[in-house]
Amino acid sequence: MEQRQYSEELITELQKNARVEVINGVEELVKPVPGQKGETRLDIVDPHVKTIIQKKMSEGIGSKPFSLNFDRNRPENITYDLTTSEVSEEEQLVEVDHDHYVDTFVFKAEHANKANPILVYFHGGAFMTGKIEEFGKQMKYIAEQAQATVIFPQYRLAPENPYPAAINDAMGIIKWASENHELLGSNSEKLVLAGDSAGSGLINSCIVLMKDTSIIARAVELYPAIDNDMKPYYDWSKFDVCPEDEQYAKNRVCRMLNSIDNFEKNYLHYKIDPRDEVVDFFNVRDWSKIPPITFILNQYDLITLVAEEFIKKAL
């Protein structure tokens, strides 16, 4: 069994110091960086994250030209198995739209509670990267902690398979999981959808396109893809950061700013208006059909500013 690369005391401190604050007009549950002192908003870069940023900056990562092969095979994308009980893993080929299959992995906790809904997780990676080798151990841990079945589909990736391939795969997997919920270990045909970044974007597309169904019980979105044009939201003054950490905090935000233009070319492939609600959740029209959504946001991230504006619009 692999060991944690950090002290569990850090997790305890995160929970202990959690507090509710109003940030940029939005009430948020804030979990300060362990070691953070005082009651002000987060103003230091997590020392563990800063070490990673420093390494990437020294290697020039982020300043080099875009390379799909490099992004798909990043050497630092390593995860650790933190489970302490048995979690089964089964690979299935799920037919979608009667013309292709999606390689799908099903993780089931040893003592999964059938009363718990199935969780379907859509990985991030700018719609162009992501694979089971990066996310599998995380899925095992989620299944164990939730005592539920977790489904991880390897949906088709751009630019080889641009819009709407990934969305069609996502909807196909959602329907399959709901229709086969009993075989998959749940008494509920309703599902919880979870995902990070681009994976959250797929969830939002499915929410719009499947609004007349009742399959989606809840969504949990980590640093969610909400608005395709994030540049208008950029305002560095909204980030509170100590001067000695500013270059590291800005590094992440600026890297994201520089990658926005690739979205329409590589994923949408100019097949749909980038402002259409199907691919831009900020422009959703029917708010009455949106299920409960939980956003989990990063400390220094352009997406955080977009999400805060979306929440204010929703309220």
List PLM regions with ranges.
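A domain-start/cap signature at the N-terminus of enzymes
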Residues: 77-92
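Alpha/beta-hydrolase superfamily serine-hydrolase fold, recognizing
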Residues: 2-22, 29-30, 36, 41, ...
